[in-house]
Design a protein with these regions (language model features):
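Polybasic, glycine- and aromatic-enriched phosphate-binding surface used to engage nucleic acids
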Residues: 93, 110, 557, 633-634, ...
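Non-catalytic DNA-recognition/assembly elements of restriction-modification systems
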Residues: 403, 748-756, 771-772, 861-948
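A short, conserved, highly charged catalytic patch centered on acidic carboxylates
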Residues: 1-122, 130, 138-140, 776
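Flexible phosphate/Mg2+-sensing switch loops adjacent to catalytic phosphate-binding sites
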Residues: 59-64, 245-249, 371-394, 416-450, ...
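Preference for the N-terminal adenyl/adenosyl cofactor-binding alpha/beta module
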Residues: 2-33, 147-415, 450-463, 467, ...
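Signature of N6-adenine DNA methyltransferases within the class I
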Residues: 70-77, 94, 98, 102-104, ...
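Short, hydrophobic/amphipathic alpha-helical patches that form generic packing surfaces
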Residues: 48-52, 227-236, 335-336, 466-473, ...
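Flexible, glycine/threonine-enriched loop-and-boundary segments that flank and lead into catalytic domains
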Residues: 379-397, 444, 490-520, 610-611, ...
Length: 948
């Protein structure tokens, strides 16, 4: 059972507002009269009223109840709400924990009486005051949820998107467009193969040719052909010409394999010729095609000669309904046909609409949609207010300065046109205009002329130009379906402005007009970190930031620099999808310092999540999305990803979002050459051998070396990251202070030191060649003379604590770890605390998503205040308890001790006790339970230590 018609979101929001007012009144009445609010007495009315908000008839509520067996007991019970393939709902009495309702719903789904074909993707639970909605994992109902949201009844009208599945939006709209787009891309692949064979394999994405001249001539010509054919296929099904299927009939009835190429070229010429300039003797079919104008058919192409297979591929494409495609999805796929891997990939490489909306939604779209919904849903809104808001939509400029095939621009335009259509319909209803307008062109004010894109690579830019026209026509049809016939768009007189060029070299102020409203800039510039940027790109960054030292700044920060320059005298906002490294390490003060100093704040942010690359063969990138404005309102929005491949979870923001994407003080942590805290010992690199492996003793060499009694005197345990983490044994020859006579007497020492000398002497580095004079010494030595703390360079993000160990001075630390003198255990205790790993996660750098330790950035800045003797002793004792707990299982490595799914209870208890002492020392007045609480203390302490 579904609703008879899809309700628009404004109506749903209005219905939900009335629903919450009515049910909040019920709850107040129950509480005032001390009446019990039990599920059995009120749940069916509650579900019925909720479903009614989405156009589902409450009289049919009995259809949604269902008997089912529970997996835990084997007994049969009654599901409160069940819509096969859509949702299962459970209600509990007022005040009851919703976990009980959620678990009961899952129990029914796992009971075996509900067939797989009817398993719903959603669970909804309520105790009348609170609701919980869960989108289940598609692979297994009992597995981790895709997303899970809990909110109060008072907030229900703010959660239209999470409840939209009840109105069938999810299945009836986007999925159909997505599947159509995938099928359309396969047809284009078939055409490309037919025209070029399957051996063509060219770079796509950031590495694609930037100009047609750089492209293989045949591939370039095919690319232009396919762009034009796409326009014609779309025109057939979307009503661009008066005669339906005009192009398909032309190909099928008036061409042969031999004549198709020249006839297509003739058609292209005609489409670019005004009606009055055409020959009067044109054949009838060709004469029916309208004048297109624009740049689509402007250039003359060399004829393409088709064969039977090529013509059949085109006819197959003609049989498809091209009006159904999501142009933003299709455009992303279309640009990839030149890649052999992408052609075989069955369409998995594209940026989803969901990911695009994560950027443009909180930047501007959600705000405009909310304003429109409130105006439309209120019967008291006069036509004048609706028209004023619609006029305002036409005052904004929208730009993607790294637009690719235009998917961000296409999605933004499509969604904004839907907002405008709702406003037009509402205005007409209030004026009493119930009939269809004879011409709606005068009613539409939002224009593709407000949309701008910059793109370095020529073919995506060409696709974007064409795709913007196609999505404009789709939007016109939606408007026409609501109020009248679509406006005439041929010949093309208004186009989106897609500029083919290097965005970082363009003067944006010359390309983008001054907007009467705001300029919104957004997109996902190239994912190039400091390690993958070229020297030319590094020079671009130096010029843009006006700094010789750009350190580790990612290439994407060039777009931030351009925005700061552009917005110096203009109003607007901007947001980019970027690699997550811009919010880590020393990039944070370098990037966010100038942004904040220019008066910007973070309007919204998505913390680290996996963004699938559009380019085939490229792994998912760990990204963040950060949006900026210069306003005071609204309150900033922040989303976290407990699972980087999962759904976002909203994080409440009380103050502001800082450069580390944390709700807290706007502090920027700078590298320090020595510890800020008087309690910390300097952490330094371990010892680097530079020996060609000849001073190291592997497990299979140990017995041989130890058999030499002289060499055996100098064998020491050797610890790098792997040995530290996994308890592996490795040794080295440590000959610092060795007796020269011993070296002369030992064949093993002589042989190995001779090999070291030869290795160093052959080095290209002068510093290494000089070390050949002292082959018995490690090339770089920093070994402490006391017990010390050993810290790995990288720790898994899954670890609950930073995995460190104390060693005695006779254990040699390799250059793959850091070490800090720790004679009394204080350094170990501080580094083992939740406070330290919180600091590391917050301000430290990362390797992909793993934590990367840096002495100058995370250790030297760790803001431990000066401790009194008693506090210091308590922390040291608590740290020793952690070591004692580890010692209960001496066979376990650090990796095994700190497996987040299998930490020993004794070890967890010891860490909890340590945390209480360290938290208290950092200034906590009560027990801390969240990362956020620790972050607030850490930033406050850092500000004190730096007088910030």
């Amino acid at each position: 059972m579904t609703s008879s018609a899809l309700l628009d979101r404004a109506t749903i929001r209005h219905n939900l507002t009335e629903f919450k007012v009515r049910w909040l009144a019920h709850i107040e009445e129950w509480k005032a009269e001390n009446r019990p609010a039990t599920e059995s007495s009120h749940d069916q009315q509650f579900w019925g009223d909720l479903l009614d908000c989405f156009g589902i008839n409450a009289r049919d509520i009995y259809l949604y109840q269902r008997s089912a067996k529970r997996a835990s007991t084997g007994r049969t019970g009654k599901i409160d709400l069940f819509m096969p393939g859509k949702v299962i709902g459970e209600a509990k009495s007022l005040g009851v924990n919703l976990d009980d309702a959620h678990n009961q719903a899952l129990d029914y789904l796992l009971g075996g009486t509900i067939p797989n074909s009817q398993l719903p993707p959603y669970v909804i639970c309520s105790n009348f005051e609170t609701l919980r909605i869960t989108r289940l994992n598609r692979d297994y109902v009992g597995d981790t949820a895709d997303w899970d949201v809990i909110f109060s009844l008072d907030e229900i009208d703010e959660h239209v998107e999470q409840l939209a599945f009840l109105a069938d939006y999810e299945t009836s709209e986007y999925r159909e467009e997505e599947q159509a787009s995938l099928e359309a891309s396969r047809l284009m692949v078939d055409l490309f193969r037919a025209m070029n064979g399957d051996d063509v394999d060219e770079a796509v994405g950031d590495e694609a040719p930037t100009t047609p001249e750089e492209e293989d001539e045949r591939v370039m010509r095919t690319s232009v052909y396919l762009t034009r054919i796409l326009f014609l296929l779309f025109g057939d099904d979307a009503g661009l010409w008066d005669t339906p299927h005009l192009f398909a009939d032309f190909v099928r009835n008036e061409t042969t394999p031999e004549s198709l190429g020249p006839q297509l070229n003739e058609l292209f010429r005609i489409l670019n010729t005004p009606i009055e300039k055409r020959s009067k003797r044109l054949p009838g079919t060709l004469a029916k095609f309208p004048y297109v104008n624009g740049a689509i058919f402007a250039d003359t192409l060399e004829p393409e000669y088709f064969d039977y297979a090529m013509r059949e591929a085109l006819l197959n494409a003609c049989d498809f309904d091209w009006s159904k495609i999501d142009v933003s999805v299709f455009g992303s796929l279309f640009q990839l046909v030149k890649s052999k891997e992408a052609r075989r990939g069955d369409g998995e490489h594209y940026t989803s609409k969901t990911n695009i909306l994560k950027t443009i939604g909180p930047l501007f779209l959600d705000e405009l949609r909310d304003q429109a919904d409130k105006l439309v849903s209120s019967p008291a809104t006069p036509v004048r207010k609706l028209e004023e808001f619609r006029d305002s939509l036409a005052t904004h400029i929208f730009c993607d300065p790294a637009c690719g095939a235009g998917n961000f621009l296409l999605t933004a335009y499509k969604e904004l046109r839907r907002i405008e259509t709702d406003l037009i319909v509402a205005s007409r209803q209030r004026r009493g205009e119930t009939g269809m307008s004879l011409n709606i062109e005068w009613e539409q004010k939002l224009s593709i002329g407000q949309f701008y894109g910059f793109e370095l690579n020529w073919w995506p830019a060409k696709i974007a130009e064409t795709a913007m026209f196609l999505v404009d026509h789709q939007a016109n049809k939606e408007l026409a379906n609501a109020v009248g016939r679509p406006p005439q768009r041929l010949p093309i007189t208004i186009t989106a402005h897609i500029v083919h060029g290097n965005a970082l070299a363009l003067d944006w102020t010359e390309v983008l007009p001054v907007a009467a409203g705001e300029t919104c800039i957004f997109g996902n510039p190239p994912f190039l970190g400091h390690a993958t940027r070229t020297e030319d790109q590094a020079n671009e960054l130096r010029e843009l930031w006006g700094a010789k030292d750009i350190s580790r700044l990612d290439y994407v920060t060039g777009w931030h620099a351009k925005c700061l320059d552009f917005f110096e005298n203009r109003s607007g906002r901007f947001a980019f999808v970027t690699t997550n490294s811009i919010t880590q390490g020393d990039q944070v003060p370098r990037l966010f310092g100038p942004i904040f100093n220019a008066g910007w704040r973070i309007r919204f942010a998505h913390r680290t999540f996996a963004w699938d690359s559009e380019a085939p063969g490229k792994a998912a990138v760990h990204c963040v999305i950060v949006g900026f404005d210069r306003a005071q309102d609204p309150r900033p929005k922040l989303w976290d990803y407990p699972n980087v491949k999962g759904e976002p979870v909203a994080v409440p923001v009380e103050r502001a979002i800082n450069g580390y994407l944390v709700d807290g003080a706007n502090v920027l942590v700078e590298k320090q050459k020595k510890p800020l805290s008087p309690e910390l010992s300097p952490a330094v690199f371990g010892n680097m051998a530079r020996d060609g492996g000849n001073l190291l003793v592997e497990a299979d060499q140990y017995e041989e070396v130890m058999s030499d009694p002289i060499a055996a005197k100098y064998v020491r345990p050797f610890r790098g990251s792997r040995e530290l983490m996994h308890g592996l044994e490795r040794w080295c020859l440590w000959l610092d202070g060795a007796n020269p006579g011993d070296i002369a007497k030992s064949p093993i020492l002589r042989q190995r030191l001779q090999a070291v000398a030869e290795f160093r002497a052959a080095s290209k580095a002068a510093s290494t060649r000089k070390m050949a004079d002292t082959p018995y010494l490690f090339g770089q030595r920093s070994q402490p003379q006391t017990d010390y703390l050993c810290l790995p360079k990288v720790v898994s993000e899954r670890r609950k604590y930073f995995t460190v160990q104390r060693y005695s001075a006779d254990v040699i630390a390799s250059d793959l770890v850091f070490h800090a003198q720790d004679p009394n255990g204080l350094q170990f205790a501080l580094a083992s605390s939740s406070m330290f790993i919180t600091w590391q996660k917050t301000v430290g750098g990362r390797l992909k998503s793993d934590l990367r330790f840096a002495n100058t950035l995370t250790w030297n800045t760790f803001p431990v205040p000066e401790l009194d003797e008693k506090t210091r002793e308590r922390i040291i004792k608590a740290g020793q308890k952690v070591l004692d707990a580890r010692a209960l299982h001496p066979d376990r490595s650090l990796a095994e001790h700190y497996n987040p799914l299998a930490m020993a209870p004794e070890l967890l208890k010891a860490h909890d006790a340590l945390d209480r002492e360290v938290d208290k020392a950092m200034g906590a007045a009560r027990k801390l339970t969240t990362e956020r609480q620790r972050q607030e203390l850490l930033f406050a302490n850092y500000a004190k230590l730096t007088n910030n």
